[in-house]
Each structure stands twice: as structure tokens, then as C-alpha cells.
């Protein structure tokens, strides 16, 4: 199946978007409907390292995690929860491990659903194992194991299928260290999109075959890397104005999953999901202030603005004063959702949405671009050339630059360092050709010679 490209927006304007409501809600798991008028907490966790020593230890660890979460949700009176299991390498390299974990988790979830009526679903995020020690091996021997991991998990209890895919990462790592804007465009917007179409066409087939949900991807490997290198307001390893361009380019790349059959909810660490929601109308999971257990960011309230599920990134399972980590963080997420759901019920959702957005809007260029009104503009620039993976990524990057420039003329403060990086990036973008074939040929020649670990055959070249 060829990907069906988006050439129009799902919403007539940005103000139509809010949290807990999507154009195309998703039914999943045990009586859960996502994006259907209420927000849902989605707890994300990691086993302790020693639990990976054997399959039996790993299953026991996930049984404890699942029981702790379900018990706490019922104990405090929350009506719904999604559990996200991000695979450790052993679970994807050995698909039966992931499958047995999924089965063990779902058995516990069914018990709590049957006894207490709590609505719930299980997401499994398969590890992108398509690499060897030296370089990515996206279409090699590991691809069949990668797909088998999806299929076995889907057959054994997972409701939502996701991955944080790595396509383009080898060129991105080279480009981001050199402030190479064409390299960011090529790695995320072009190589990433090519790989996404391959894998999400196959994942969506598995979901259809198994009666599960092809949920979505995230550009964690690239846009989040740029965000992390950028750091906070004291850091100068990477200009935040470059990190935000990487984020804008990641939106058309993450969009490909939905063009190839995914239906949401998009995965939590895709900060670009607000743009994807504006284009597709599909439900999205977001993370922000509740992901401080895993990393800091500069837009912790703002990203709640239009979420359908609200997540915490990931937390290692261990004890805290208030219970285990998964109990503490799932309760925090659920209280945030209770507030959003009350706002929806009392028709104050847009007031709360705008307060969350305004609290971070001018903190950083990354927050400014992801404010829902500006994110909508980036979406419009993408669908304008929706059939061309190069032009739509280039459009997103240039529109991002325009938005930040407009912000800097107002309340958004940029240092000289950030301002110069933005001007240089925009000049580099405007110097690029409009012809996709020329851009792709030029980049293939350049990065094939400069990046030793870049294997064009990974992308069908």
C-alpha cells in the first residue's frame, strides 16, 4: 500500500484544537476510547537493569509494575489508564520475551478491569534493533525479527503498537554536530520519511491482521537528540533555534506513520505531535512537566495544551516514599488528567489550554514554535506540498524560522548566539533548490563520502 499523503488540515483553524478531543477517536483495549472527550494518563516505565538477567526475572518485574499501577489507579479512584512498555533490547531481539511480558501484563489488567471496571489499554513500544555494532542495518537480517516482535506482542495482549525508529540517525548525528542545516533536512525529512514509510506500512498490516492498533512513531532519535544537546537556557552546545528547526522538520517525518496506516495515539516523546494532530485530527499522547523523572524541558505546561493522553516519558521501577515510582507518577498523571477532564466537562477547556500554553510560550523558541497556533501554521506549510517529502520538510523549516523571527520582534527574547544561528540557518534553507531530485542526489554524494557509517542501501538507493 502506498502512503496516502496529507494535503489539507484536519481542523479549519488552530482554535478548534483542544485536549482530550480529536477528530478521529480510537477505540482500544478494555473499553477505552482515546480522544473522545476525555484525557487519559499513560504511564511509562523501565525495569531495573538487574531484571534483564533472564526472561523469568523480566516477566516478574513487569508483573509487579503492572499490579502497582492498576492497584494505585483503583485505590485513588481514577477511571482509566494506559500502560506503555518500552522494550529493553532483550524483549525485541527475542520476540518471545516481549510476547510473554505482554501476556503477563494484560492478564493483570483484565483482572482489574473485570473486578473494578477500570478502562485500560497496553502499548508496547518495540525497540528499533535494526543495527549492528558499526552502523544501521535498517533493511537487513534484523528486519524480520523486528516485525516478528510486533506480531508476537500484538498476538499476546498489546493493544497499541509503537516504535521510536532510527532512520536517518547516522547522517543526523554528523549534521547536528556541524550545524549542518541541509544535513538535518536530509536526515530527518528525507531519509527518516523513507524509512518510516517502509516500517509503518508493515506495522499497520500486522495491526490489521491481529486486530490491534497501529499507533505511531516519534522522532526521538533525532529531534529529541537536538533538544537534549540544546539543553537549558545556560547551555550553548547547540542553539535552541537550530533544535527547534529539527523539531519542525520532524513533524512531516512522524506524519508518515499516519500516512501509512497508523491511527494514533501518537507516542509520548514526539513533541512534534501537536503539529501532527493539527494535520491528521488523530489523538496524540504528549509529555512535559511529568517527564522530569527522565529529562528536563522548557515547555512542561505548554505541551499539555492539546494532548489526548498525558505521559511521563519513562521512570525506572523502584521504591519512593509515596510508593513505587510507577505508583507515584501514574497518580500525578491521573490528577493532571482529572483537571483537564473537569475543564472539558465545565466547558473551560480552552481557558485551561491557553493558560498552559501561555505559561511557557515565551520561555524558549522551542516552546514558541510548538504553541498550538504556531504549530498549526507549521502544519499548513507541510500540507501545502504534502506530496513531496523534501519540499514539505523544507517548508516546515522555513516557516519555523519565520515564526521565531516574528516572536523575536515581540516578547520572545533571543540571545545574540540564538539570533545568529537562526539567521544562518534560514539563509542555508533559502539557498536550497526546489527540485527534490537535485537535493537528494547532492546529499547522497556528499554524505556517502563524508559519513563512513552511511549505507545508502538502508534506504533503497
From Swiss-Prot:
GO terms for molecular function: metal ion binding; methanol-5-hydroxybenzimidazolylcobamide Co-methyltransferase activity. Zn(2+) binds at residues 164, 220, 269. InterPro entries: MeOH-cob_MeTrfase_bsu (IPR021079). Keywords: Metal-binding, Methyltransferase, Transferase, Zinc. Its EC number is 2.1.1.90. It catalyses: Co(I)-[methanol-specific corrinoid protein] + methanol + H(+) = methyl-Co(III)-[methanol-specific corrinoid protein] + H2O. GO terms for biological process: methylation. It comes from the Archaea. It is an enzyme of class 2 (transferase). Belongs to the MtaB family. Heterotetramer, composed of 2 MtaB and 2 MtaC subunits. Methyltransferase involved in methanogenesis in the methanol pathway. Catalyzes the methylation of the MtaC-bound cob(I)amide. NCBIfam families: MtaB_Meth (NF040651). This is Methanol--corrinoid protein co-methyltransferase. It comes from Methanosarcina barkeri (strain Fusaro / DSM 804).
Amino acid at each position: 500500500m502506498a502512503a496516502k499523503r496529507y494535503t489539507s488540515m484536519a481542523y479549519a483553524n488552530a482554535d478548534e484544537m483542544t485536549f482530550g478531543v480529536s477528530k478521529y477517536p480510537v477505540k482500544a483495549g478494555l473499553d477505552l476510547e482515546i480522544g473522545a472527550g476525555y484525557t487519559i494518563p499513560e504511564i511509562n516505565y523501565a525495569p531495573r537493569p538487574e531484571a534483564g538477567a533472564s526472561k523469568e526475572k523480566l516477566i516478574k518485574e513487569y508483573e509487579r509494575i503492572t499490579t502497582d499501577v492498576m492497584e494505585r489507579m483503583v485505590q485513588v479512584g481514577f477511571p482509566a489508564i494506559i500502560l506503555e512498555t518500552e522494550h529493553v533490547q532483550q524483549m525485541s531481539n527475542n520476540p518471545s520475551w516481549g510476547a510473554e511480558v505482554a501476556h503477563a501484563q494484560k492478564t493483570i489488567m483484565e483482572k482489574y478491569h473485570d473486578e473494578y471496571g477500570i478502562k485500560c489499554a497496553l502499548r508496547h513500544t518495540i525497540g528499533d534493533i535494526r543495527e549492528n555494532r558499526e552502523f544501521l542495518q535498517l533493511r537487513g537480517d534484523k528486519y524480520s525479527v523486528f516485525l516478528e516482535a510486533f506480531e508476537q506482542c500484538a498476538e499476546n495482549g498489546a493493544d497499541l503498537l509503537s516504535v521510536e525508529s532510527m532512520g536517518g540517525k547516522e547522517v543526523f548525528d554528523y549534521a547536528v554536530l556541524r550545524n549542518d542545516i541541509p544535513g538535518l533536512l536530509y536526515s530527518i525529512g528525507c531519509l527518516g520519511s523513507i524509512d518510516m514509510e517502509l516500517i509503518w506500512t508493515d506495522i499497520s498490516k500486522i495491526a490489521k491482521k491481529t486486530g490491534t492498533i497501529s499507533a505511531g512513531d516519534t522522532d526521538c532519535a533525532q529531534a529529541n537528540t537536538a533538544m537534549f544537546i540544546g539543553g537549558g537556557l545556560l547551555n550553548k552546545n547547540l542553539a535552541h533555534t537550530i533544535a527547534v528547526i529539527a523539531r519542525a522538520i520532524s513533524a512531516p517525518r512522524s506524519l508518515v506513520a499516519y500516512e501509512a496506516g497508523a491511527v494514533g495515539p501518537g507516542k509520548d516523546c514526539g513533541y512534534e505531535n501537536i503539529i501532527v494532530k493539527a494535520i491528521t485530527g488523530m489523538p496524540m499522547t504528549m509529555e512535559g512537566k511529568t517527564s522530569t523523572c527522565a529529562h528536563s524541558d522548557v515547555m512542561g505546561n505548554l505541551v499539555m495544551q492539546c494532548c489526548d493522553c498525558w505521559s511521563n516519558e519513562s521512570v525506572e521501577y523502584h521504591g519512593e516514599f509515596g510508593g513505587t515510582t510507577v505508583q507515584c507518577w501514574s497518580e500525578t498523571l491521573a490528577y493532571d488528567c482529572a483537571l483537564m477532564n473537569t475543564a472539558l466537562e465545565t466547558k473551560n477547556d480552552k481557558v485551561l489550554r491557553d493558560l498552559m500554553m501561555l505559561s511557557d510560550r515565551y520561555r524558549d523558541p522551542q516552546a514558541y514554535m510548538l504553541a498550538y497556533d504556531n504549530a498549526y501554521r507549521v502544519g499548513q506549510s507541510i500540507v501545502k506540498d504534502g506530496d513531496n517529502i523534501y519540499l514539505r520538510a523544507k517548508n516546515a523549516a522555513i516557516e519555523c524560522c519565520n515564526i521565531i523571527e516574528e516572536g523575536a520582534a515581540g516578547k520572545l527574547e533571543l540571545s545574540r548566539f540564538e539570533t545568529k544561528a537562526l539567521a544562518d540557518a534560514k539563509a542555508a534553507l533559502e539557498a536550497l533548490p526546489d527540485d527534490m531530485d537535485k537535493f537528494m542526489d547532492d546529499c547522497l554524494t556528499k554524505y556517502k563520502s563524508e559519513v563512513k557509517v552511511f549505507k545508502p542501501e538502508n534506504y533503497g538507493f
